[in-house]
Amino acid sequence: ASGDAERAELIAAAQQLQWRNKAISDTYEPGSTFKIITLAMALEEGVVDMNSSFYCGGSTSVLGRSTPVRCWKSGGHGSQTLTQAVQHSCNVAFVNIGQRIGEERFYDYAEAFGFFERTGDSSAQLTGTTGIDLGGESGSIWWSEDVFCNPENLSQLAAASFGQTFNITPLQLITAVSAC
């Protein structure tokens, strides 16, 4: 009988070790859910308003990128208002919005939203956490400032504008959206 109790205890301990709180321990590319953050940055900076319009032909060229950034709708959305660009989740419109914000301001906002903390080394890849008092919290994965803010290569800004090529935890995304 004592063997059964020990075995049950070992199984319980092993299961506990396997448990992870994925909201804080795993990072993901946020994709289109990040467009809320980009939109908040743009509205705050006054680079877009409810009268802004965008044209989506299905793709757009970006300085420093050999292939165009494509919208999920290959034929494009055509002319659209800001509201329609959000409703359509249009990547091309959000690349344009990101370019209006600019790489330096976008980077500053990303830091202000808590996705990373600058270290003083502009060539360092950055991470950030929410500071939640739970074990196992992972940090985000962001570009170095030198790479992101390179005016001759805006591909990172373009991709970040619609939530690609960086990783954050679900809790970081929820925290940032709550601040919008």
Per-segment meaning from a language model:
Residues 1-32, 37-180:
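Beta-lactam-recognizing serine transpeptidase/beta-lactamase-like catalytic domain environment
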